A protein has these predicted regions:
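Non-catalytic alpha-helical scaffolds and adjoining flexible linkers that form interface surfaces
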Residues: 1-20, 25-250
Length: 250
């Protein structure tokens, strides 16, 4: 039986000298592994739709417990990413996070929409890279089950707390912190909290429709990254590479 899916390619792994295995994210089936036969051959029609960060339509069939591509065509290649190494490296970081957060055979349309919207923003919209990155990281943390509590100090209810507990994912006042508490706290400005509240709660299609001052933006960029890696308890090689490119350009 044939199955037609629309999917984003998150990872490409060589299988042999002719074939490759694709890790893809779908709307209705979650994360899947599919085999692309002959994709490594010269002039294969599967090259474009099967490349990393390609969004395409795939017709697959199941054989010996594995999905294999029968035919495929591209829906969006995000060419704006492929002409810019820095943007491409950030896109691959998004893909690595999405692969970790998603699960086999568990639908996650919100994660697919988030990743596609952020790739589109990098490729075609006039949105700062760091803003796209922070919005993706914070929203991905929510989809992974780590939605932060962003409405007042968790201890006293003060509406304007000035610290964010990275491990607990909540706001607090300096005076409410227990002297023997563990975890790292980062300072937050009201503008930073407002932006975080917007990112966590907005429609994905309007993810970048907010204003933020320069100092609050710098806080947001650092906090979103640190919060995601703290909650997922791991680093990302793609993130390290992206940051090395930024350092080289400074």
């Amino acid at each position: 039986m044939y199955l037609t899916i629309q999917a984003l390619v998150l990872r490409v792994t060589d299988y042999n000298d002719r074939d490759a295995l694709l890790t893809v994210l779908t709307r209705n089936y979650g994360k899947l592994t599919i085999k692309a036969r002959g994709v490594r051959r010269k002039n294969s029609p599967l090259v474009a739709p099967c490349q990393l960060l390609s969004y395409g339509e795939f017709t697959v069939f199941e054989y010996r417990g594995m999905y294999t591509i029968n035919e495929a065509h591209s829906l969006e290649l995000f060419q704006g990413l492929r002409r810019d190494l820095q943007k491409l490296s950030l896109g691959t970081y998004f893909a690595q996070v999405a692969e970790l957060v998603s699960q086999e055979d568990l639908p996650n349309p919100e994660l697919l929409a988030l990743t596609l919207n952020c790739l589109y923003a990098l490729a075609k919209l006039d949105v700062p890279e760091q803003m796209v990155k922070a919005a993706f990281e914070l929203r991905a943390a929510c989809l992974a089950g780590y939605t932060p509590d962003l409405y007042g100090c968790h201890a006293c209810g003060c509406p304007n707390p000035d610290r964010f507990d990275l491990a607990a994912g909540r706001l607090e006042c300096m005076t409410c912190r227990s002297v023997d508490s563990d975890g790292i706290r980062m300072p937050v400005l009201p503008g930073t909290v407002d932006a975080m509240q917007y990112i966590v709660g907005c429609d994905t299609k309007r993810l970048f429709s907010f204003q933020i001052g320069d100092e609050s933006a710098r806080q947001l960029y650092q906090l979103a990254e640190t919060y995601l890696v703290t909650q997922l308890e791991r680093g990302f090689s793609t993130l390290d590479f992206y940051k090395s490119l930024i350092v080289d350009l400074v």
